[in-house]
Amino acid sequence: MSTVVQQVPAELQAALTLINNDPRMRTNNAWALSADKRWSLKFTAELSVPCSSFMPDNSVWHLVLWQEETLIRIEVYPDKSEGISATFQHQNYNFSDASTREWTSGNPCLENTPTVFGRNLWGLEPEALLDRISWRLSRLLLWIDAAAQEKLATTGDAVELPAFPDQSPFTVIGFSEQIDDLPFWASKTGEWGFASSTGLPGAHGTLFLREFLDNKGKLIRTTKWSPFMRKGARTTNAVWSVLPTLPVLAPWQAPRTWQELSHCFAQCGLSLPDLFSDIGRSVRALRKQRAPGLLLLGFPLENKIGDEPARIHWLALRLAGLSNTMTKRPGFRPTERNRRTWDREQPLSQEPIRWVRTQNWAADQLRTRGEAANDIRSKKVLIIGAGSLGSMIAENLMRIGVVSQGILDADLLQTGNLSRHALTMTSVGHNKAAALVEHLNRILPDASARSFSCAFPPESEVAKNSLRQYDVIIDCTGDDGVLKSLAAFDWKSEKIFISLAMTWRAEGLFAFAASETSFPVTDASSRFNASASPEIDMDEARIEGIGCWHPVFPARADDVQLWAAVGTKFICRVVSAPGRIYEYFKQMPDGTVEKEPHEY
């Protein structure tokens, strides 16, 4: 409940004047302050273009401001009685709830796209409060005109799914759909079946889809996930159905009730009541099939408006209303025919849908925040040496999309290693390679790392043949003996060899690369020795622990992280343009890095 306040801040009073001075806006109302400290002002906005069936000439809105930590939020909401009732693109779901607030939930998106990054200087929105209010109101006028003309989303724009009402805040169902998968699912339009899922170990409220079966329970598709994710048990707890298009009500409203979803099915020439009847009959007939709790709706989705569909996308909602073999109703016989009739009732009800959030965990979707070029993402990479530098480079490569990795190391992880290693205390006492691979396979769903818990070269012929399958061989041992072994090993084909080693106190980084059938150890060693790197000073060495004099390499975690970043970029460059390359990187006292290239 809001109350009119006699003493209104000067900036808000100025905003009222600003509205009445605009020929397309007007208000006779006063500012009101709600119990939850939200200022609101009711006003009318007028179109400058012809009206449409969803956008009238005049619509009533509420300008709402409130304090959110150190910022003042400014939003505009439709009035419950005289505002727009439809939901458009670039608008939150527009619903009139039973609260005492006078406005609905459907505030349009008026922000400039760059502001989502939290940097106002990237956008056009000003900083002063009154200027921000004026800017938002002018954006609203542009928005209602575009909505009336159906121009909120135009050809070439990125496709945006509608806002789903009452969607779970963090329960997430992950799936993986690539571009190549679309023809398979397009052939299943109008069909349905069962699906299994597994809980993501250690995560909160997160599932991922494992297998798809037809409606007879026969396996038709398996989703590939990381070895870590495949350890969990599968539960067949979902039903899938493929639609020819996104289920949406004009102009851009996600269905809120089962009846609205039935209407979307009917628009596609399908019947949701028939689907429920068929699902119920199959579940009751399959004695080992537990009652599914989720309904997955798949449909082809394009990346940009006007493009051809690129891949299948899945929506999820809680499945309810199906009868089981024990379902009875007073006055009715508990027959299969009656239960099929009862199953058809839920899709025609006004009961709200409980939408569940879904995400596409396909490789190209996971790394939209940043990934390596395809040149290296397509390569199989072997890292020899899972110490501080090797572990951090392996993690960097995994996160940017180099998912097929082999890690080789014979050593066990010591507690002392943890001060500058990617691993944690839970890995102490384990083989470094095996523990690092376990860590890598937990990073992202498409990870595919394997370990070789041995020294190089391995004695086993099976292991030797496995190593020969890798395209890029990265040495992170800092051991001259390993370089000689790299040269002596019969790789059978041309490889991209890379050797990275930190200098004393991690003041510099040696970086050598070659694309040949064997590692050119003489050239690499001579390059390393010729570089102006700091001399080893045993007086600066640290002891491993009290009671023994076993010197350890002095370097801080931030130094190792720096060289891991530089080394990762070097690896990416070399793979994109193979050849003999040697570079020496030196860290300056202020933390900057200088590169000393060496010509061939």
Swiss-Prot record:
GO BP terms in the entry: cyclic threonylcarbamoyladenosine biosynthetic process; defense response to virus
EC number: 2.3.2.-
Catalytic machinery residues: C109, C548
Phenotype of gene-disrupted mutants: Essential for CBASS function; when the operon missing this gene is introduced in E.coli it no longer protects against phages T2, T4, T5 or T6.
Region listing for Adenylation plus E1-like domain, in residue ranges: 375-600
Transmembrane annotation, as ranges: none
Region (E2-like domain): 1-158
Site, as annotated: Adenylated: R420
Residues in the signal sequence: none
InterPro entries registered for this protein in UniProt: ThiF/MoeB/HesA, ThiF_NAD_FAD-bd, Ubiquitin-activating_enz
UniProt KW keywords: Antiviral defense, Isopeptide bond, Transferase
Name of one Pfam family that matches: ThiF
Residues covered by region (Linker domain): 159-373
Superkingdom of origin organism: Bacteria
Matching SUPFAM superfamilies: Activating enzymes of the ubiquitin-like proteins
Molecular function as annotated in GO: transferase activity; tRNA threonylcarbamoyladenosine dehydratase; ubiquitin-like modifier activating enzyme activity
Induction profile: Part of a CBASS operon consisting of cap4-cdnD-cap2-cap3.
CDD domains: E1_enzyme_family
Assembly: Crystallizes as a Cap2 homodimer bound on each side by a CdnD monomer.
Record function comment: CD-NTase priming component of a CBASS antiviral system. CBASS (cyclic oligonucleotide-based antiphage signaling system) provides immunity against bacteriophages. The CD-NTase protein (CdnD) synthesizes cyclic nucleotides in response to infection; these serve as specific second messenger signals. The signals activate a diverse range of effectors, leading to bacterial cell death and thus abortive phage infection. A type II-C(AAG) CBASS system.
Family membership: In the C-terminal section; belongs to the HesA/MoeB/ThiF family.
Additional remark text: Has the E1 and E2 ubiquitin conjugation active sites and the adenylation site; Cap2 may recognize the target as well.
Record note on domains: Has an N-terminal E2-like domain, a linker and a C-terminal adenylation plus E1-like domain, dimerizes via the E1-like domain.
Name recorded for this polypeptide: ATP-dependent ubiquitin transferase-like protein Cap2
Organism: Enterobacter hormaechei subsp. hoffmannii (strain UCI 50)
Gene: cap2
